[in-house]
Amino acid sequence: MIKCFDKNNEVYNLIKNLTERLNIEILEVNIFRNKNGGKIQIVLYSKDFSLGIDLLTDLHKMILLILEASLEYSFTLELSTPGIDRRIKSDREFQIFEGKKIKLMLDNEFEEGFILESKSKSFIFKTESKELNVSYSDVKKARLV
């Protein structure tokens, strides 16, 4: 299985022009391969609009055409959105989810707050009572709420 956000990933590179033009972020690409073909799972997100079922259906058709024209193995394609309680998996996702409410674990307990601003090595986390500059390396867990 290839599970990643990797800018060198073949699937990512095949669909990035389409998603960039539509102002949609590729959060994750999971590729499962076996002797009979494979399965490709892609998680998409947009800050500007909701990715509802109708839009995902249209995106599925467009992405499927792009991938079928280029990939030399049979596969099924699954598209999804991050979901309300997505675990934040990378520094890049803190930038993507700027302004969103999260649960953050730094020590051994969760705190709820908002990602105010994402920087190269840290982000500003605002709770009801304080603002913290949090280094990505200090984050034990984080998820959307």
Curated annotation (Swiss-Prot):
Pfam family name, one: RimP_N
Name the domain of life. Bacteria
Q: Does the keyword Protein biosynthesis apply?
A: no
Keywords, A to Z, come to:
Cytoplasm, Ribosome biogenesis
- Show the PANTHER family listed in the entry: RIBOSOME MATURATION FACTOR RIMP
NCBIfam families the UniProt entry points to? PRK14630.1 (NF011223)
Protein's UniProt name: Ribosome maturation factor RimP
